[in-house]
Amino acid sequence: MMAHQHPYYLVEQSPWPLTGAISGLMMNLGLVLWFHTGNIILLFTGLLLLILTLVNWWRDIVREATFQGSHTAIVENGLRYPMILFITSEVCFFFAFFWAFFHSSLAPAVEIGVTWPPSGITPLNPFLVPLLNTAVLLSSGVTITWSHHSILAGNRNEAIQALFLTVVLGIYFTILQAWEYIDAPFTIADSVYGSTFFVATGFHGLHVIIGTTFLLVCLIRLSGHHFSTHHHFGFEAAAWYWHFVDVVWLFLYVCIYWWGS
């Protein structure tokens, strides 16, 4: 490798952006094919290629950051701004769902009986599973902060325990959400209420799964001594993302589950 008189890391050629784009195309085409013909093979093939891309791309980044020392302090500082912009874009993403919800609920149309929830819709009790899910996510926010402070204090064992609890709570939340969907007395096809409910909470559930995956990778890396008190941006980025997921859920609970019911 040629020496460069600057502190920035120049990435090497990688096949993963191309395979990631191909997997995205395959999943989109596979989804359409599944809807129209019931054939799910292309969708699952694209998903498998996406997982393969993520695993290998993650492996390369871990190698560059941890074993090759390519992520200097200046490089890490440069990674913080894209992560902040990414979370900001996610805020805008969920803002659209809240806009659709309030547009439909504050002035209900005559087609749904000029009432909210619409006529014939039995909303979920916000003080049962949704309240438990709120407690689970708030608890996970506490444990991820506990893990972060343990890393800063150099207490690796405590950091691993706290991060493990966070991953368990994330999985538990996903199980509860799936159970709630199965038992829900309405579907995504039941008026604008069902559409906004399942799209907003469903995309949040997807973000919880993604965040849990991030934290699981961080747990593996933490167990492998990849993080130190001064070099753990991968964990910090995952923690930021998890706190964002927590905050979005609080808005979902208050607006859709409690006020919307």
Curated annotation (Swiss-Prot):
The chain crosses the membrane at residues 31-51, 82-102, 126-146, 159-179, 197-217, 239-259. The gene is COIII. GO terms for cellular component: mitochondrial inner membrane. Its EC number is 7.1.1.9. It is found in: Mitochondrion inner membrane. One of its GO terms (molecular function) is cytochrome-c oxidase activity. Component of the cytochrome c oxidase, the last enzyme in the mitochondrial electron transport chain which drives oxidative phosphorylation. The respiratory chain contains 3 multisubunit complexes succinate dehydrogenase (complex II, CII), ubiquinol-cytochrome c oxidoreductase (cytochrome b-c1 complex, complex III, CIII) and cytochrome c oxidase (complex IV, CIV), that cooperate to transfer electrons derived from NADH and succinate to molecular oxygen, creating an electrochemical gradient over the inner membrane that drives transmembrane transport and the ATP synthase. Component of the cytochrome c oxidase (complex IV, CIV), a multisubunit enzyme composed of a catalytic core of 3 subunits and several supernumerary subunits. The complex exists as a monomer or a dimer and forms supercomplexes (SCs) in the inner mitochondrial membrane with ubiquinol-cytochrome c oxidoreductase (cytochrome b-c1 complex, complex III, CIII). Coiled coil: none annotated. This is Cytochrome c oxidase subunit 3. Belongs to the cytochrome c oxidase subunit 3 family. Its main location: mitochondrion. It catalyses: 4 Fe(II)-[cytochrome c] + O2 + 8 H(+)(in) = 4 Fe(III)-[cytochrome c] + 2 H2O + 4 H(+)(out). One of its GO terms (biological process) is mitochondrial electron transport, cytochrome c to oxygen. Pfam families: COX3 (PF00510). SUPFAM superfamilies: Cytochrome c oxidase subunit III-like (SSF81452). It is an enzyme of class 7 (translocase). InterPro entries: Cyt_c/ubiquinol_Oxase_su3, Cyt_c_oxase_su3_dom, Cyt_c_oxidase-like_su3, Cyt_c_oxidase_su3-like_sf, Cyt_c_oxidase_su3_a-hlx. Keywords: Membrane, Mitochondrion, Mitochondrion inner membrane, Translocase, Transmembrane, Transmembrane helix. Disulfide bonds: none annotated. It is a multi-pass membrane protein.
